[in-house]
Structures are given as structure tokens and as C-alpha cells.
């Protein structure tokens, strides 16, 4: 997705789902189980679980798998204790990365992330070296094949949305992190979203030529392939039709 949207990585990420479905499902199941363990198995009262389940639905995970993951989280058979880790790093050409991980072995995860970066020309940064370049925002995306754009925009603005982007068959509602739950709840009374999540959005993006962009994307994808890596946020400007 190119153009004015701040969420230009969504189509690229969704396009990789089929090729990496099993690994993606494993990560989503882990996130669902941990969210259920931390906040309970009711998605209406557990925002983190609701976000995790929404991601699983977007990835076309079977309902049975989602329910099993929730039951695992609230049961006594969770297995290993998992830790949330965040790494700040740089890829090539000054592109900043924030790498979110869930792991049962901190040393293994640190070694794997460091190895991917060092072999690709990137490097780990100190805490705070990158995070100031990003801020949390809520994203709620709707398919215009299902709903009328004007109705979504009207209700989103009434609910307190910060911004609204329209591109192709999608409308993307942007909220502050604090207002995400309230805005999404109001919109959910009339519309069913395709995507609803809180993400780290860069203050500005780094524009590169196609060869450079492809090299950075390769690093990001290698990190995403790591078993313990849940999300990789970056400030690379992705342009599909770059010359």
C-alpha cells in the first residue's frame, strides 16, 4: 500500500501470511494464551486478549484453534514461563527498529536477534536509542465493500478519532492509544472491523531507493522469522512502485 496512509505495511504483512502460516499461527497462539493468562479468558473484559484474537481472525486462524489457545492460557498446562522483551536496533541506512518478543529463554532470544542483525549489517541499540522516534497509536480498519465510507467517518469523528485515511477499498481510523478502546467499542456497535490494534508508529520515515529498501525489508523479514519475535516496528517508508 503506497500513498498517504501511515499504515503502509499492512498489505505487505498480510501478503506473507500464506507462506508463513504455521509460524504465524504459533506466535498468535502464544500471544492469545499469555493474554488470557494475564487478564482472563473473556475478550470483552480483556483488551489485550481481544487484540490478540482479532489478529488471529485476520490471519484466518480457525475458531477452534483460538478457543484452545484461550483455554490453555486460563488452565494449568501453560508450560514454560514467558517473558516480554523489547529490543531497540538499527537496520541498514539508519532505519530504526523496535523488536517485540515473547520468550521462555531470554538468552536464546537475545542471541538470535543479535545474530540476525550482525549478519545483515544492523546492530542492537541501547534502551531509549530508538523508542523516542515512535509513538503508540490505535488502528481500526474497515472494508468498504461491507460499509458506506461516510457512515464510518461520521461515527469515528463523533467517537473521538484523531485521523481517518481512505485508500482503495479500506478506511483506516487512527486513534490515540488511550482512546483506542472507547473509539473501537463505539464503532463496533455498527461496524465489524478487519483490523483493530495498537501499534508503534514512527514520527517520520526514512526514504530509500529500491535496492536499499529491499535490503532493509530482508532484515525485517529475517527478524520476523525468528520464533520468539512477535512484532517488528520500523520507520522505513515502503513504496510499492518505487523506481
From Swiss-Prot:
<dbReference type="GO" id="GO:0006355">
    <property type="term" value="P:regulation of DNA-templated transcription"/>
</dbReference>
<keyword id="KW-0804">Transcription</keyword>
<keyword id="KW-0805">Transcription regulation</keyword>
<protein>
    <recommendedName>
        <fullName>Probable transcriptional regulatory protein BDU_30</fullName>
    </recommendedName>
</protein>
<keyword id="KW-0238">DNA-binding</keyword>
<comment type="similarity">
    <text>Belongs to the TACO1 family.</text>
</comment>
<dbReference type="Pfam" id="PF01709">
    <property type="entry name" value="Transcrip_reg"/>
</dbReference>
<dbReference type="InterPro" id="IPR029072">
    <property type="entry name" value="YebC-like"/>
</dbReference>
<dbReference type="InterPro" id="IPR048300">
    <property type="entry name" value="TACO1_YebC-like_2nd/3rd_dom"/>
</dbReference>
<dbReference type="InterPro" id="IPR002876">
    <property type="entry name" value="Transcrip_reg_TACO1-like"/>
</dbReference>
<dbReference type="Pfam" id="PF20772">
    <property type="entry name" value="TACO1_YebC_N"/>
</dbReference>
<dbReference type="GO" id="GO:0005829">
    <property type="term" value="C:cytosol"/>
</dbReference>
<dbReference type="GO" id="GO:0003677">
    <property type="term" value="F:DNA binding"/>
</dbReference>
<dbReference type="InterPro" id="IPR017856">
    <property type="entry name" value="Integrase-like_N"/>
</dbReference>
<dbReference type="InterPro" id="IPR026564">
    <property type="entry name" value="Transcrip_reg_TACO1-like_dom3"/>
</dbReference>
<dbReference type="InterPro" id="IPR049083">
    <property type="entry name" value="TACO1_YebC_N"/>
</dbReference>
<keyword id="KW-0963">Cytoplasm</keyword>
Amino acid at each position: 500500500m503506497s500513498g498517504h496512509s501511515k499504515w503502509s505495511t499492512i498489505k505487505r504483512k498480510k501478503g506473507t501470511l500464506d507462506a508463513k502460516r504455521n509460524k504465524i499461527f504459533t506466535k498468535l497462539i502464544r500471544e492469545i494464551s499469555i493474554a488470557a493468562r494475564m487478564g482472563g479468558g473473556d475478550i470483552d473484559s480483556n483488551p489485550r486478549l481481544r487484540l490478540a484474537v482479532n489478529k488471529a481472525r485476520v490471519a484466518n486462524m480457525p475458531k477452534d484453534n483460538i478457543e484452545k489457545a484461550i483455554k490453555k492460557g486460563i488452565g494449568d498446562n501453560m508450560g514454560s514461563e514467558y517473558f516480554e522483551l523489547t529490543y531497540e536496533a538499527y537496520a541498514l541506512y539508519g532505519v530504526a527498529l523496535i523488536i517485540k518478543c515473547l520468550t521462555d529463554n531470554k538468552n536464546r532470544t537475545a542471541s538470535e536477534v543479535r545474530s540476525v542483525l550482525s549478519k545483515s549489517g544492523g546492530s542492537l541499540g541501547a534502551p531509549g536509542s530508538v523508542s523516542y522516534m515512535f509513538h503508540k497509536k490505535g488502528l481500526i480498519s474497515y472494508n468498504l465493500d461491507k460499509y458506506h465510507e461516510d457512515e464510518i467517518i461520521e461515527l469515528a469523528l463523533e467517537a473521538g478519532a484523531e485521523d481517518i485515511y481512505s485508500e482503495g477499498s479500506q478506511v483506516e481510523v487512527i486513534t490515540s492509544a488511550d482512546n483506542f478502546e472507547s473509539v473501537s467499542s463505539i464503532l463496533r456497535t455498527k461496524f465489524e472491523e478487519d483490523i483493530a490494534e495498537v501499534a508503534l508508529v514512527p514520527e517520520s520515515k526514512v526514504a530509500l531507493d529500491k535496492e536499499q529498501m529491499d535490503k532493509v525489508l530482508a532484515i525485517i523479514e529475517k527478524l520476523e522469522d525468528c520464533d520468539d519475535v512477535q512484532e517488528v516496528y520500523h520507520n522505513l517508508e515502503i513504496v510499492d512502485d518505487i523506481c
